[in-house]
Amino acid sequence: MSEQIQSVGRRKEAVCRLYLTPGSGKWLVNGRTLGDYFPRPTLVSAIQQPFTLTDTLGRFDVKATIDGGGVSGQAGAVRLAVARALVQVDETNRKKLREFGLLTRDAREVERKKPGRAGARKRFQFSKR
């Protein structure tokens, strides 16, 4: 496998276009390193989970372009894109990644604010008198 593998991951409003090439484990996220772009260690470990589950950590170089969303949504988008790319690399990875739910797109979105209310569910303060 010497060619570049391309995949897409989405979470909330974030979209990640990811390119996976055989290499030494270098990460480039929007032109920055993984630890620089995602300073929280929990997000970094969540992003690298597909690699650790399939024992491929450090075997691929990753270039990711992320648009939209917040930090958590972007991390989820990268994680899904990595998992999808690893399935393209080797179909036997599918069973393990599916078992841990890494190939399922998280469909939860923000519920819209309703008229006459403070938020999606919250009401304005009720006064009896």
Swiss-Prot record:
SUPFAM superfamilies registered for this protein in UniProt: Ribosomal protein S5 domain 2-like
Gene3D superfamilies in UniProt: 3.30.230.10
GO BP annotation list: translation
Keywords: Ribonucleoprotein, Ribosomal protein
Alphabetical list of InterPro entries matching this protein: Ribosomal_Su5_D2-typ_SF, Ribosomal_uS9, Ribosomal_uS9_bac/plastid, Ribosomal_uS9_CS, Ribsml_uS5_D2-typ_fold_subgr
Signal peptide: none
Domain of life according to the entry: Bacteria
Entry GO MF terms: RNA binding; structural constituent of ribosome
CC terms in the record's Gene Ontology section: cytoplasm; small ribosomal subunit
Similarity section: Belongs to the universal ribosomal protein uS9 family.
Name of the molecule in the record: Small ribosomal subunit protein uS9
Species, as recorded: Gemmatimonas aurantiaca (strain DSM 14586 / JCM 11422 / NBRC 100505 / T-27)
